[in-house]
């Protein structure tokens, strides 16, 4: 069970951090 929980936690973090980095790179390119 802890493995599944950490797996979903990793997916949640990845789905949150990845778009944030993508938006950050886009803003840097716009500047």
Curated annotation (Swiss-Prot):
Protein biosynthesis is among the record's keywords: no
Topology of the protein relative to the lipid bilayer: Single-pass membrane protein
Keywords (A to Z) from UniProt: Chloroplast, Electron transport, Membrane, Photosynthesis, Plastid, Thylakoid, Transmembrane, Transmembrane helix, Transport
GO cellular component: chloroplast thylakoid membrane; cytochrome b6f complex
InterPro entries the record matches: Cyt_b6/f_cplx_su6 (IPR007802)
Subunit structure and binding partners: The 4 large subunits of the cytochrome b6-f complex are cytochrome b6, subunit IV (17 kDa polypeptide, PetD), cytochrome f and the Rieske protein, while the 4 small subunits are PetG, PetL, PetM and PetN. The complex functions as a dimer.
This protein's name: Cytochrome b6-f complex subunit 6
Protein species of origin: Buxus microphylla
Lineage: Eukaryota, Viridiplantae, Streptophyta, Embryophyta, Tracheophyta
């Amino acid at each position: 069970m802890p493995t599944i929980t950490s797996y979903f936690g990793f997916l949640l973090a990845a789905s949150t951090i990845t778009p944030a980095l993508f938006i950050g790179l886009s803003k840097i390119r716009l500047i």
